[in-house]
Swiss-Prot record:
UniProt keyword Disulfide bond, yes or no: yes
CDD domains listed in its UniProt record: Wnt_Wnt5b
SS bonds (residue pairs): 81-92, 131-139, 141-159, 215-229, 217-224, 286-317, 302-312, 316-356, 332-347, 334-344, 339-340
Family per record: Belongs to the Wnt family.
GO CC, alphabetical: extracellular space
Post-translational events: Palmitoleoylation is required for efficient binding to frizzled receptors. Depalmitoleoylation leads to Wnt signaling pathway inhibition.
Organism for this UniProt entry: Ambystoma mexicanum (Axolotl)
Domain of life (superkingdom): Eukaryota
Expression sites (tissue/organ): Predominantly in neuroectodermal tissues.
Protein name, as recorded: Protein Wnt-5b
The gene coding this protein: WNT-5B
Species classification: Eukaryota, Metazoa, Chordata, Craniata, Vertebrata
MF-aspect GO terms: cytokine activity; frizzled binding; signaling receptor binding
InterPro entries named in the record: Wnt, Wnt_C, Wnt_CS
Lipidation (O-palmitoleoyl serine): 221
């Protein structure tokens, strides 16, 4: 990508902000507006984004039209994280500052690994689609080669999601902060940097791997005698499900004297570039703890009959739960009327709900 690596090299001369203090994820909270909306003569928006590292600010200045979509990607990743963990003690809750997730991300846990991966995946997803939609000046439709297993009579063309460009740009931008760091070999700080880079890559690979051919039929009366196919991103829920499986099988790692991550337990297989890794055990997230950033589970809804993580016994960490009644309003007794609408009544139901003490 022209100019990006030179800009990143120059950015290495600058001093990075304190680890974990801020994050580009905050672009999800404060989306950057389109460049054409800036007031002429105003200070460039990139210099005002304190959550970006020096290298990321350089990329922002060069690719300002990309920033809105980086924010969208971060928002997509955060939303998916909250969906995947909604029934867990840690539910990917955010805080109202530029760290986005608070101090909990300073722990090199499985949860941190997933968050880095799904956020990086969100950027690939958003940039790839923006290319296809003609929103960015430096990319367009996908130019990926025809899949070998595509039916020989089908046409390969159309305007596909540009996953190649999305992957490359996300790698340069998201990894920039980690690449600017120069910690002592074998240090805990270096271990965390390598962990972040591994998980960022796993997230990007998930989007790349799950993208597939989509086709449209042509022919007389929809006979589908001919198809035109193109590359299309997978639904992001599929990416989230894939990364959640990687979370469940994440590898515990430690740093060695050579400055490389190695398995804590050699009986397991080495992680591939598609796997998540972590360096710290997760806190239990049961109680609010300012030092770890845990918000605790006080007041969380739980399922009285479930034996899973959403069950009251596990969610409430054995502290017990309170029961209360709530009124739910739902559509009911729906009927189709000619032509052509459905008319429903509203039904109310009193249901029991349970919250952790």
């Amino acid at each position: 990508m022209p100019g990006i690596r030179l800009l990143l090299a120059a950015a290495l001369l600058c001093c990075p902000p304190p680890a974990g203090a801020t994050s580009w994820w905050s672009l999800a909270q404060n989306p950057v507006q389109r460049p054409e909306m800036y007031i002429i003569g105003a200070q460039p928006v990139c210099s005002q984004l304190s959550s970006l590292s020096p290298g990321q600010k350089k990329l922002c200045q060069l690719y300002q039209d990309h920033m809105m979509y980086i924010g969208e990607g971060a928002k997509t990743g955060i939303k998916e994280c909250q969906y995947q963990f909604k029934q867990r003690r840690w539910n990917c809750s955010t805080v109202d500052n530029t760290s986005v997730f608070g101090r909990v991300m300073q722990i090199g846990s499985r949860e941190t690994a997933f968050t880095y991966a799904v956020s990086a995946a969100g950027v690939v997803n958003a940039i790839s689609r923006a290319c296809r939609e003609g929103e960015l000046s430096t990319c367009g439709c996908s130019r990926t080669t025809r899949p070998k297993d595509l039916h020989r009579d089908w046409l390969w063309g159309g305007c596909g999601d540009n996953v190649d460009y999305g992957y490359r740009f996300a790698k340069e931008f998201v990894d920039a902060r980690e690449r600017e760091k120069n910690y002592p070999k074998g240090s805990e700080e270096q271990a965390r940097t390598l962990m972040n880079l591994q998980n960022n890559e796993a997230g990007r690979r998930a989007v790349y791997k799950l993208a597939d051919a989509a086709c449209k039929c042509h022919g007389v009366s929809g006979s589908c005698s001919l198809k035109t196919c193109w590359l299309q991103l997978a639904d992001f829920r599929k990416v989230g499900d894939h990364l959640k499986e990687k979370y469940d099988s994440a590898a515990a790692m430690r740093i060695n004297r050579k400055g490389k991550l190695e398995l804590v337990n050699n009986r397991f297989n080495l992680p591939t570039v598609e796997d998540l890794v972590y360096t710290d055990q997760s806190p239990d997230y049961c109680l609010r703890n300012e030092s770890t950033g845990s918000l605790g589970t006080l007041g969380r809804l739980c399922n009285k009959t479930s034996e899973g993580m959403d069950g009251c016994e596990l969610m409430c960490c054995g502290r017990g739960y309170d029961q209360f009644k709530t009124v739910q309003v739902e559509r009911c007794h729906c009927k189709f009327h000619w032509c052509c609408f459905v008319k429903c009544k509203k039904c109310t139901e009193i249901v029991d709900q349970y919250v952790c003490k």
